[in-house]
């Protein structure tokens, strides 16, 4: 079996794994409601702002933190959005693990940074 056959085999297994099925199903439900999509978009924007603030100031502003907590509480009460975010998180763990396994198999340092 060649590399591409194995890649297709992995794709088939991935397609049917419970975490991917759940992400797919919750994604469909999310797309059925514009308010949920807007809530998710707003949450993502706030997450980005918090990340940016943390990078530049080493701390998230009180205002951003309050907004995140407020929207997070609202999302926690919205089953569709919270289920989607949970499914996305579970999938992200699997995806990161797969990428790590593949990177370890390739075993090539592509950073080209000088090491001191």
Curated annotation (Swiss-Prot):
HAMAP family: UPF0342 (MF_01526). Coiled coil: none annotated. This is UPF0342 protein CTC_01059. Belongs to the UPF0342 family. Pfam families: Com_YlbF. The lineage of its organism: Bacteria, Bacillati, Bacillota, Clostridia, Eubacteriales. It comes from the Bacteria. InterPro entries: Com_YlbF, YheA/YmcA-like_dom_sf.
